[in-house]
């Protein structure tokens, strides 16, 4: 039986998760009931004939930015199954159930942090989020301009910090909007782990960039960094140079398309790209209507293959006039066909139409509509760094 866990079934939830994550049941219980998940999630469970929990995962609701708009998102966490019940298809059935739940709650997107990308592809998820990790020698930062002033930000500055963070993140597809609960949790974490939070201000005393960082030995590790423009980013980089007596290098986590190496004295620094999280579209029609389109185009059609969310498993006719996307559905032969995995990558902007065609992710039935297809799906910055 697949269902939403009751309070009575929580003990079975903790037992199953504790086994899979190698934690005690009490540790799992304390982590969930004292942390940000408490009262903010549903656990989807599979029960055996004795009504014992054999498989479980959580749906954690978030608001996220997509195309500059705030939409609902279902985060998947704690996927667990006891070994005696694996291979029976329970997790697949649970995902199907969860997509019905998300549809009822208007969660347009979903995402997760995979232990194996190939496993979660079976449920329609695909690689949509990557971060870039760079290590910069401290002396490479000496020639950047200083801000008019710098100020350490405290928890009482939380509203200033979060408003600026939202202002920057609304330009990106995927970041979580931190509500009061999540913001308090993050600030408490910074306080408890000796992170410092600083802002850079211009000559009008306006916040133009900010970051949270921690000194570890001779290295500064930056947890978050937000900046209005290139100048304000360089103001932060110079701030780190002021720490040169204690620091040999700075580690930054950046968007994968960030071009920071172009502004450094030498691009030969240590850097790497890490495939981070997977994303999935739960409601295709609603997601298409959210897109911001640069150029109008005539109607063309896309067939989506999605056997776990049958409302997506159809042909969508798409057109754009005056920057507004119009969508209708039918079962005619489509100009393009693809699975929900690759559609999810395309609509987030992790890949563009040309890449999808080149990599044979799309079946093309009408080559005359490729130009319009490329107008709909183009490259964008994606980001999902929230842990869940």
Question: Where do the protein language model's features map onto the residues?
Answer:
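Intrinsically disordered, low-complexity, positively biased terminal segments
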Residues: 11, 151-388
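Conserved active-site alpha-helix within GNAT-family acetyltransferase domains
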Residues: 104-108, 114-132, 257-273
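Short amphipathic alpha-helix that is part of the acyltransferase structural core
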Residues: 1-61, 68-75, 142-182, 216-221
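Flexible glycine-/small-residue-enriched beta->alpha junction loops
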Residues: 127-143
């Amino acid at each position: 039986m697949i269902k939403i866990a009751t309070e009575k079934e929580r003990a079975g939830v903790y037992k199953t998760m504790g086994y899979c994550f190698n934690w005690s049941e009490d540790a799992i219980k304390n982590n969930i009931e004292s942390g940000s998940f408490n009262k903010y999630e549903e656990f989807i469970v599979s029960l055996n004939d004795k009504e014992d929990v054999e498989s479980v995962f959580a749906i954690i609701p978030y608001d996220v930015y997509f195309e500059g708009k705030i939409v609902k998102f279902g985060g998947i966490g704690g996927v667990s199954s006891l070994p005696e019940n694996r291979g029976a298809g329970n997790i697949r059935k649970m995902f199907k159930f969860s997509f019905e739940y998300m549809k009822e709650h208007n969660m347009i997107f979903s995402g997760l942090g995979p232990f194996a990308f190939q496993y979660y592809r079976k449920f329609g998820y695909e690689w949509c989020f990557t971060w870039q990790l760079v290590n910069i020698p401290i002396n490479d930062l000496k020639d950047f301009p200083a801000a008019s002033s710098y100020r350490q930000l405290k928890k009482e500055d939380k509203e200033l910090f979060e408003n600026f963070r939202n202002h920057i993140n609304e330009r990106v597809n995927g970041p979580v909007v931190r509500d009061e609960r999540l913001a308090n949790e993050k600030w408490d974490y910074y306080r408890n782990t000796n992170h410092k939070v600083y802002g850079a201000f211009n000559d009008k005393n306006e916040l133009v960039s900010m970051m949270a960082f921690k000194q570890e030995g001779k290295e500064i590790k930056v947890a978050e960094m937000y900046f209005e423009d290139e100048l304000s980013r360089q103001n932060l980089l110079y701030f780190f140079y002021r720490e040169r007596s204690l620091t040999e290098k700075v580690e930054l986590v950046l968007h994968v398309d960030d071009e920071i190496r172009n502004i450094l004295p030498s691009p030969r620094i240590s850097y790497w790209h890490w495939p981070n999280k997977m994303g999935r579209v739960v409601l295709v029609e609603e997601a298409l209507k959210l897109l911001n389109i640069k150029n109008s185009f005539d109607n063309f059609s896309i067939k989506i293959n999605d056997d776990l969310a049958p409302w997506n498993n159809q042909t969508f006719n798409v057109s754009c006039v005056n920057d507004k996307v119009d969508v209708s559905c039918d079962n005619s032969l489509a100009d393009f066909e693809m699975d929900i995995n690759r559609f999810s990558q395309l609509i987030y902007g992790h890949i563009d139409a040309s890449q999808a065609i080149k990599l044979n992710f799309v079946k093309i039935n009408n080559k005359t509509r490729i130009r319009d297809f490329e107008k709909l799906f183009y490259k964008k910055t994606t980001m999902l760094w929230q842990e869940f």
